[in-house]
């Protein structure tokens, strides 16, 4: 998707003394789109033409994506037969993995249609970080709707001044539900080298749902 020239010299907010508003070309809009995803009001939802302030509602809609909480490992090692997954855990010292991570903080994960996987601290309710999958990043310019520049939800304030709110399209982003599982595998160290031995790791897979065919791990 191409990034549209949303704010330019003929746009709704063209007269604002701001370095990111009223410029022709796409460079300001590329930066504005990134800032919008980070919570700024680049598309002027409150109609005051201040595109550097924080939006009142930052989080995109969580539609089909279910919330998944990851805390201390708690899978069972109680088994009655050797063909059970619990037997495999017990035979490969899952108990040690569980003990070593008993204080792992609880984090809630969910995908939103702002194109991000969100990690939210389960105790404080504050977002710790968000991840934009590369495939979904390529879809983000599709939220820009040039026809909505200054023409969405037009209202008037107490003094009779026109207030226009706009302007993005609703799209599907990270629309699938995260899946979590403890896996016994060889991973990579901080230098990117493959480990020589296997160990237990908690793996989070993020399908995109209606955002597109694919997933991230």
Where are these regions (language model features)?
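A fold-level detector for beta-propeller and closely related beta-sheet-rich head/sensor domains
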Residues: 1-217
């Amino acid at each position: 998707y191409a990034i549209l020239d949303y704010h330019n010299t003929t746009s709704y907010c063209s007269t604002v003394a701001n370095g990111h508003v009223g410029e022709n070309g796409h460079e300001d809009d590329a930066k504005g789109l990134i800032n919008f995803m980070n919570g700024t009001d680049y598309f002027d939802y409150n109609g005051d033409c201040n595109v550097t302030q924080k939006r009142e509602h930052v989080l995109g809609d969580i539609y089909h994506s279910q919330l998944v909480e990851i805390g201390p490992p708690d899978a069972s090692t109680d088994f009655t037969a050797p063909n059970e997954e619990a037997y495999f855990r017990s035979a490969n010292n899952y108990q040690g993995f569980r003990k070593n991570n008993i204080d792992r903080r609880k984090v809630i994960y969910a995908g939103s249609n702002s194109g991000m996987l969100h990690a939210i601290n389960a105790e404080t309710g504050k977002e710790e970080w968000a991840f934009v999958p590369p495939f979904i990043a390529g879809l983000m310019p599709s939220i820009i709707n040039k026809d909505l520049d200054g023409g969405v939800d037009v209202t008037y304030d107490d003094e009779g001044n026109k207030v226009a709110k706009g302007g993005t399209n609703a799209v599907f982003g990270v629309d699938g539900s995260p899946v979590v599982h403890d896996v016994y595998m060889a991973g990579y160290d901080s230098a990117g080298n493959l480990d020589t031995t296997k160990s237990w790791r908690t793996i989070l897979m993020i399908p995109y749902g209606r955002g597109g065919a694919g997933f991230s791990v």
